[in-house]
Amino acid sequence: MELSGKRITLGVTGGIAAYKAAELVRQLVKLGATVRVVMTEAATRFVTPVTFQALSGHPVYCDQWDARVANNMAHIELSREADIILVAPASADFLAKLAHGLADDLVSTLALARNCPLLAAPAMNLQMWSNPATQRNVATLRSDGIALLGPASGDQACGEVGLGRMIEAEEIVEDVVAFFQPKHLAGKCVLMTAGPTFEAIDPVRGITNLSSGKMGFALARAAREAGADVTLVCGPVSQATPRGITRINVASALKMHAEVMQRIAGQDVFIGVAAVADYRPATPSAQKIKKDGCKAPSLELVQNPAAQSDMPQILGLGMLVSATVVTAAVVWWGIRSIEQRTSLR
């Protein structure tokens, strides 16, 4: 499990987004993390401590004078036992306290007394988020090395729409997992391709394949978690874009080729795992091809460019990774592919 053995202290502050923290605890525990929950008094008005105790399997702390903690030093014990402190949701009030070193409840005291990294997922009304005072606090926190996860833009509980809502639990978990990954690719730029291509026969038909893009998107996520700046050029797929990744949507092999060529300069790594069609119709019909009795239409096909093998710009990169699918003679095709690419250097 991706978070096996990791110890996370989760701070929950007051706000309607506190209900999302329950799902966050469930997902973190499912990935193997040990989660201890600390709540402000305001947070308990939205979700009860019993909910978090049931989901985490550990007592929940709301009072810095909790007698269950030796010497009444919960802010020390809970921070020293954690690999990270995660505050989600992080209210405007909490961000202000943290930026100015205030500590008047268990969550803010815990954050001030920590000797481990702190991640916070802001959640507030869009006007509160855009307020100059909040933005000054955000700038201070970022300069202090605190990782802010979000916020997102969308519908808010107050009925307004805009930036300020807490990102979803799944997105926070992605960021937490990424935080713990070794940053072997920090400072590197990675360009990737994924998914199928669609080669039009006419306005409604085309040649494609069964690629889902899952492998390419998983590799893109792993590269981002390793610290890389990732650009993903992908064919028509339904995969959600991993956080922090620049996604370029294309349809045909020619479009994918053009996008790769446009962005290849300055890249350190190219990973080509798209299922690019080998051939395309030479002259796609401008109109839908109608049935003509029993006569089947004939298609003239031309070869598509192979991004991995015919571009010196790509072959000159520090690292090139490509993939292909074969149904027989796997070793032979692998050796042949390597020989072809080596001969182009």
Task: Please report, for each region that a protein language model flagged, where it lies by residue.
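Intrinsically disordered, highly charged
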Residues: D310, Q340-R345
